[in-house]
Amino acid sequence: MKIAILSRDGTLYSCKRLREAAIQRGHLVEILDPLSCYMNINPAASSIHYKGRKLPHFDAVIPRIGTAITFYGTAALRQFEMLGSYPLNESVAIARARDKLRSMQLLARQGIDLPVTGIAHSPDDTSDLIDMVGGAPLVVKLVEGTQGIGVVLAETRQAAESVIDAFRGLNAHILVQEYIKEAQGCDIRCLVVGDEVVAAIERRAKEGDFRSNLHRGGVASVARITPQEREIAIKAARTMALDVAGVDILRANRGPLVMEVNASPGLEGIEKTTGIDIAGKMIRWIERHATTEYCLKTGG
């Protein structure tokens, strides 16, 4: 099987592991920078070119598309899809998951529990927005933020008003969310492949912080998840129509709450913590689904 990995940096852990896992199972792998792909959109002879050459047909494409290049990255992936390549996460699903507001709306519609959340663009009535989510303490986020950037814990009403007013000056979309104190700076990252949670870790924030992101200095350990948490993680990934997803869950007194569904979850922290060959599981999923029938069905 010929597999393309779409990534701006092939030296990253996740890309290297996926490449190794694919090669170990006898596949040919090429890492392509999606921003260097350019496309001929033609009803008679569509194609993708890369650094001066027309690309051959790939049986499957693994998107490792960063948030900053979502628009062009998903456009390139969509072109591969139109040419009959099987995508490990479809372009439309990635775009859906990257839209935090749309994601939360879809999860809520499916009855998946979330922290109480409000969203606004430059709200005129900051006080009412704070009341809407139950008052302080609360978390204020920029909708476009990633890896804990643009996330502030406001412990008092006055602090919340100050943060919201400051964000309002950025002319940005603001997300205001209840603070789950009982989570104590921890969350659970469930790695879903298909209809299975293949690994789970607990991420604990570093001292003095409440953001558990490993990129922000959080510490990971193996997590034992409940059947309810497993079911919610799988349901959240299905709601986003993602074959591979990192589902972040907070353990609240009222039950597990989904914080986020990540369409391009990093493998380093969770593989090194659990010792599970997640990259291999992803390749085996591709082997089961990147079939000749799929290629014919999609016109490749």
Swiss-Prot record:
PROSITE patterns the record matches? ATP_GRASP
Q: If you read the UniProt record, what top EC class would you report for this enzyme, in one word?
A: ligase
**Which of this chain's residues are annotated to bind ATP?**
141, 178-179, 187, 211-213
Query: ATP-grasp domain: from which residue to which, for each copy?
Result: 104-287
Protein residues bound to Mn(2+) 2: 260, 262
Known cofactor(s)? Mg(2+); Mn(2+)
Q: Which GO terms describe its molecular function?
A: ATP binding; metal ion binding; ribosomal S6-glutamic acid ligase activity
- Pfam family of this protein, just one? Rimk_N
Q: Which SUPFAM superfamilies match?
A: Glutathione synthetase ATP-binding domain-like
Cite the binding residues for Mg(2+) 2: 260, 262
Amino acids binding Mn(2+) 1:
248, 260
Query: In the record's cofactor note, how is the cofactor described as bound?
Result: Binds 2 magnesium or manganese ions per subunit.
Alphabetical keyword list: ATP-binding, Ligase, Magnesium, Manganese, Metal-binding, Nucleotide-binding, Protein biosynthesis
Stretches assigned to coiled coil: none
Does this entry carry the keyword Metal-binding? yes
Give an example GO cellular component term for this record: cytoplasm
Look up the EC number in the record and give it: 6.3.2.-
A Gene Ontology biological process term: translation
For the ligand (Mg(2+) 1), the binding residues are 248, 260
Q: Would the keyword Metal-binding turn up in this protein's UniProt record?
A: yes
Q: What does this protein do?
A: An L-glutamate ligase that catalyzes the ATP-dependent post-translational addition of glutamate residues to the C-terminus of ribosomal protein bS6 (RpsF). Is also able to catalyze the synthesis of poly-alpha-glutamate in vitro, via ATP hydrolysis from unprotected glutamate as substrate. The number of glutamate residues added to either RpsF or to poly-alpha-glutamate changes with pH.
Similarity-based family: Belongs to the RimK family.
Q: Which HAMAP family match?
A: RimK
Please identify the protein, giving its name as recorded: Ribosomal protein bS6--L-glutamate ligase
Per the UniProt record, the source organism is Escherichia coli (strain SMS-3-5 / SECEC)
